[in-house]
């Protein structure tokens, strides 16, 4: 498995726990986040941790699974399209790509509804006004793209069985598979 934008290794850790024989490669640009991933995977010989910018990196090897969680939305649209092509090339035949990420809402009305629901939910969790403001400030750096566009870009890159597997408000899990032939 290749985990793009792996951060502290949370997603890769869940996969490694569920599939103990899996070989896992984590890529992230943040040395600070990867330091926590190194702690998480201390003593594991089958885990490779690489500090690099995956948006421009060429991936070596073939992977059965490539996944990313809450990272690709930081890329511009043309970078997403390029990344999807490179992901396809790095997958083994029949391999799958899964992206769990925020997407752009297709209408202003839905955006208002989703925003109100998000604020309600995080407020119930005890998020303070300052924390909410900080989250909104971080979101200014996001480069969200509509889900429909990203599904189309996956198909254009050559993925098959492209679909959205889960969606709640702006959060979606989607991906596709590399053809066998």
Model-assigned labels for residue ranges:
Residues 2, 8-56:
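Class I SAM-dependent methyltransferase SAM/SAH-binding core
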Residues 18, 73-75:
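A short His-aromatic
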Residues 59-66:
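A short acidic, Gly/Pro-enriched loop at the edge of an enzyme's catalytic core
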Residues 68-72, 100:
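Residues lining the SAM
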Residues 81-93:
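A short glycine-rich, Lys/Arg-flanked "PGG" loop and its adjoining helix->strand segment in the class I
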Residues 100-156:
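C-terminal alpha-helical "lid/dimerization" subdomain adjacent to the S-adenosyl-L-methionine
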Residues 160-181:
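Core SAM-dependent methyltransferase catalytic element
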